[in-house]
Amino acid sequence: MSSIARPPDPCLVAIILIVRSRAGPRFVFHYPPNPLSENGLRPVRKERRTSRSKNGQGYKSNESSSSEESGSSSDDDEDEHQRQLQSQNQSQSHLSGSVVSGRRSSNFGLDDHVAMSVSPGGDSQRAGSMGSGRTSFRKRGGNSDVEEDSGAASDRQEDGSGGAGGPYRPPWESLLGLPADVWEKLLSPSPAWHKRRFEVGINDLAFIGWPVFVREDGTWRKQRRKKKKKWRAEWEGGELGHNENAEDAPDDEDGDAGGNASGGGGLMAASTETLSPKQMALSEAKRGSGSSSKAARSSVDCLDGDDKDSMTMFNVVFVLDPPLLEYSMRTREIYDNIIKKFAKALKWEQARTDYVWREAQHISHLKEKAKERRTSLNTLYTELINQSSLARAIYTVYTSISASKIASVQLSPDVSISLQIPPLTSTPYLPGPTDKAYPGLWLTTADSVTPVEDPTADENTAPHQVLAKHFALLLLDNEAAILKDVEASGGALAPALAHYLRCSKPTKSFAQISASSGIPLSTIQMLASHLVYWRRARAIPPIHQRDTYIVSPNCDLSKLEIATAAYQVAFPTLPSLPKMLSALSGTPRPYGSFIPSKDHKETYFAILAWLLRGGWVTQLRSFARVKVTPEIKMAVEVALRREEVDKYLRKGRSLEAQKSADGENGNEADENDDASSSSSSSLASQGSGDETPMPGRYQQESNLRLSHSMLDRNTSLRTSSLILFPHRASPLESRWLEQIVSRFPEHPRTAGRHRRGEGSNAAGGEIDPEYAALSTPMKDLWPTYIKYFNGLDALEKIPVREGLKRKLVWQVLTRLGLVTSQQSSIELDPREQVLVSVRHW
């Protein structure tokens, strides 16, 4: 698997709605109507199967060939079907499958006997049975349950699909080659799966849902203890202008109501209603006469009166086809961001207005009428999406999420929800020869969490993580347009967002905006995260004229002509886009050198923001590590060996003194012993000195060997080394750093050259503040800078994080050996040249 970080790939094949009542489970609705044709890019699928077979998990050769024959036999029908769909009315455009036409998809035909597995919630890898026991996709005969191609099934009346004289089976009562009753049983779990991740694996597909069961008291939501105030029937929105925090959402059994809902007409519009019981009654009456036809509603009400049935469970199941090596990541992101939140919103509306059950009955009634009239598949789905808000919601979620867009779904006049998989806004890698390229994606390492920012940070943190206070906000749209959307939303965050947007500048960090505007830093970070999450802004290092910017190697030159026209409209009197890109393609130099005068500063900053917004340029940043020369290594080696020898000699002298003292005490106690016996024993000990154990002798040698553990025998003393992480240095690396610091001069060479006053007494004058970094001993500056010399943190962070002037910081870095395109006239001391630096994005 490549290290390239990929944009969201939902791998979405279909969405299924299953409900269970006292009469049993029911397959209510699925979209798209025929995933076999809408996701049928068979050549790509063949490559995936071939790669899996190499790993011992693919099909056998005969099965693969059978599948290939089955796929090719229906190509002509599919081509004819595509031509028919292209000529469809605009009202039926939702059946064309254009949303997923560019996605990697396949033939998902399933046998009656399929290998499947059910796994509990979690982020585990695909279960073993999903890759084993695979069945071939065989073309079936007249008695088959395989779903027919929609070109034949949707545009003509059929006498029956169960053979000559058999009962009529409409095409919408089967999915992926299996009849609806199979899916009803398979995707209707037991109550033990209530509000848990329910996952079923069948061949290459994953079926993931979040089933919701009715409570024992017959309600769908735990009733909280109400205080003496009116009941609030509101769903706090999660799009622009609305807070998506769990504590601001309605109380739920698990303390989180899904969070990302909003009301409104447009993508960024949102409204939150607080309804009294009277308003709720009016809202129900309004909803009853809304999008659905009154005749159909009255028919359903009649059925409800006779049936007296009630729903006990609903499960919205998402059918996914993720790549095998990305299975866990892709399923987790769509489960956390889409499946769970969508099901929670439906649960909340079901508890409030019996929404899911009413819509399920309405959909079933429309399908029964279509079956009686033998309506075509296209006509039925057009009718369902026009008349059922739940069917329309599932359709919107599928089409938007498949295209990696924000799905704004309106469940009722009072409640809507916005869902998305947070997009990838940047990448630190250039694609390799075998990797898929994403031209125009911002190429930078600036948004990565580094050890200095958060040493314990997890790479898989949530998208709403707190942004670093030293970042700035770059709006991805016109400020006036965003302000208009925010003010129109009317959400709880709208006033704060509008105030922050007016104060925000890409040249000022969050901390600087907080200090100048009086807005608390935590509030700014929350508002900025809100804008970033909803794709209206991007967090970047603050723009500065002393920073260096280059043309991004990942820029999309195919859009240069369109971008040039847009650039000309935005900056008509300034150099054209090709000229700006040509200038930035030369020798890297600070951006301030491109600004003609101070009067043009703000305008050129606006140009830079425009270029960054489109991914045309990226910041060229410097990184450094501490270099340990052979001279330093040898000095530390000699010092360590001297310490070991001294320690060994000290222990030896102390043991000899102890031995002599013990000998004197022994002679006094044994002076009356037999002389010959004592002499004999003494001679024997002297004759076998190498074989007779002496107290402490081997223990001393052992201690000497163990103390050598600091001396790494694999380290070469003749070559230089780099210290990767100075703030987590090993004992030996710590000794190297101590030796480096000990060699720094006490008085810099330039200390006397940058004092105020001239003449013989200049050395005793005050230090010029402009050159304070050149006159300060490096030993005093070293602790502030060393933590950034890890090769991961850009040196451009130091002035912002430490609150230092950029000029002084670069003077210190130049003394330490930083190589830049602009070399100053600073006199360097070789004893301070300890850095190895590189420059990249």
UniProtKB/Swiss-Prot annotation:
Entry function: Mediates inactivation of the TORC1 complex in response to amino acid starvation. Required for meiotic nuclear division.
Protein name: Nitrogen permease regulator 3
Bias (Basic residues): 43-52, 221-231
Keywords: Meiosis, Signal
Comp. bias intervals (Basic and acidic residues): 232-245
Region annotation (Disordered) ranges: 30-172, 221-301, 656-698
InterPro entries: HTH_NPRL3 (IPR056603), Npr3 (IPR005365)
PANTHER family referenced in this protein's UniProt entry, alphabetically: CGTHBA PROTEIN -14 GENE PROTEIN (PTHR13153), GATOR COMPLEX PROTEIN NPRL3 (PTHR13153:SF5)
Low complexity compositional bias, start-end: 61-73, 84-106, 288-299, 675-689
UniProt KW Signal keyword: yes
Residue spans of biased composition, Gly residues class: 257-267
Cellular component terms per the entry's GO annotation: GATOR1 complex
Organism: Neosartorya fischeri (strain ATCC 1020 / DSM 3700 / CBS 544.65 / FGSC A1164 / JCM 1740 / NRRL 181 / WB 181) (Aspergillus fischerianus)
Listed Acidic residues bias regions: 246-256, 665-674
GO biological process terms on file: cellular response to amino acid starvation; meiotic cell cycle; negative regulation of TORC1 signaling; positive regulation of autophagy; TORC1 signaling
Family listed: Belongs to the NPR3 family.
Residues in the signal sequence: 1-23
